[in-house]
């Protein structure tokens, strides 16, 4: 095994990534999971409210929620996502010595699995996992569009911000894999529009009518009744976000902007370190057989990016948003690879010295963070 590592340094980078992920996990489980724990406590006990689907499912199995369940569910979801992505990469590229650099730049990116480990318990990873499923299942029938709509509804019920976070990427995957690959007719176009309207209506219902209908003191008391250790009241200090109106969220975000904006150069540097991957992605788009496909893919990338710009203006978890934006780019890359191409696009070269240096740096960065870089 050592000889193989020495012959192919990209295998060594994979091993380093695995070790870093273990380290991030060990560090993460020592931190109090404030908001993720509350998400396991909140259910539809008081009626339809936002951010309550996960807690409602948990309530079906247990009346008392232990703290370790945050890490157990988060860890299980992370492992499932890892398995799904490994399967997707195998389907798209295969695992060979030539594809290893591409795999390291995606799976080993601090934007992707390493940051999902750092944000263990948060809801972002559910959008990624469901989008990967849509990249794996057959896409020829309306059942695919219906499945995408169902996934989008589930994501909005988990957290309404998914309408901006992963639903645009899911729409892009549906357009590429179903409408571009199999053609459009009045039936599937009408079905897609109705599905989009239904998901949008659910978002507005969750955002504007999904507020908690009882006083905050009653809500906190209900949360305490579901805690396995009610003495840990410190874990409930963010319960106020279920009462916070959109205007207050935007105000807080802009109030912190002068400080948080300092992280933008770091984000730009992290994005630049993925230049070999972005170059491959651009060449992949340029090699598409259809000009229409090329224009629609570029429009989709702009649309997904604009959704994240809106998120940046509304909520200040900038490190999470930029990381999930990069993950969306990775997933759309896989979708584009499934479209007909006029020519073969060369993979990321393992022989280029600059690429090797960038791959090493990307590997050594353990995460991007939640609000500010690292």
Question: What spans do the regions from the language model cover?
Answer:
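Membrane-interface micro-motifs in multi-pass membrane enzymes
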Residues: 44-52, 98-137, 158, 314-333, ...
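Short hydrophobic/aromatic helix or loop-helix immediately within or flanking a transmembrane segment
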Residues: 45-76
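Membrane-water interface signatures at transmembrane helix termini and the short loops
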Residues: 112-123, 267-340
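Perimembrane helix-loop-helix junctions
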Residues: 166-196
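Transmembrane-helix motifs of polytopic, lipid-linked glycan transferases
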Residues: 75-98, 133
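Membrane-interface alpha helices of multi-pass inner-membrane proteins
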Residues: 145-171
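Membrane-interface transmembrane helices that cradle and orient dolichyl/undecaprenyl
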Residues: 130-145, 179-181
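Membrane-lumen/periplasm interface segments of specific transmembrane helices
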Residues: 22-30, 188-280
């Amino acid at each position: 095994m050592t000889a193989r590592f020495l012959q192919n340094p990209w295998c060594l980078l994979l091993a380093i990534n695995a070790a870093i992920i273990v380290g991030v996990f060990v560090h993460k489980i020592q931190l109090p999971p404030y908001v993720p724990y509350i998400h396991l406590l909140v259910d539809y006990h008081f009626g339809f409210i936002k951010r309550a689907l996960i807690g409602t499912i948990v309530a079906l199995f247990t009346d008392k929620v232990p703290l370790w369940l945050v890490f157990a569910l988060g860890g299980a979801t992370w492992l499932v996502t890892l398995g799904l992505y490994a399967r997707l990469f195998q389907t798209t590229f295969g695992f060979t010595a030539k594809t290893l650099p591409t795999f390291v730049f995606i799976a080993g990116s601090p934007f992707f699995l390493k940051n999902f480990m750092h944000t263990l318990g948060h809801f972002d990873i559910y959008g990624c996992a469901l989008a990967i499923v849509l990249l794996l299942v057959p896409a020829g029938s309306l059942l695919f569009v219906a499945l995408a709509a169902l996934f989008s509804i589930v994501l909005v019920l988990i957290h309404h911000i998914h309408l901006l976070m992963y639903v645009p990427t899911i729409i892009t995957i549906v357009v590429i894999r179903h409408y571009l690959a199999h053609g459009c007719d009045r039936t599937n176009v009408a079905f897609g529009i109705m599905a989009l309207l239904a998901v949008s209506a659910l978002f507005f219902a969750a955002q504007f009518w999904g507020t908690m209908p009882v006083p905050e003191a009653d809500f906190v008391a209900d949360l305490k009744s579901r805690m396995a250790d009610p003495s840990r009241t410190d874990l409930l200090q963010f319960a106020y976000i279920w009462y916070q109106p959109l205007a207050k969220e935007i105000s807080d975000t802009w109030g912190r902007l002068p400080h948080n904006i300092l992280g933008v150069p770091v984000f730009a540097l992290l994005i630049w370190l993925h230049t070999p991957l972005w170059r491959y992605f651009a060449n992949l788009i340029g090699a598409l057989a259809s000009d229409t496909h090329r224009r629609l893919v570029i429009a989709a990338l702009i649309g997904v990016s604009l959704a994240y710009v809106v998120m940046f203006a509304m909520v200040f978890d900038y490190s999470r948003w930029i990381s999930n934006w990069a993950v969306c780019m990775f997933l759309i890359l896989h979708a584009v690879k499934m479209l007909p191409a006029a020519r073969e696009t060369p993979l990321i070269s393992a022989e280029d010295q600059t690429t090797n240096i960038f791959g090493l740096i990307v590997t050594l960065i353990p995460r991007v963070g939640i609000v500010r870089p690292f």
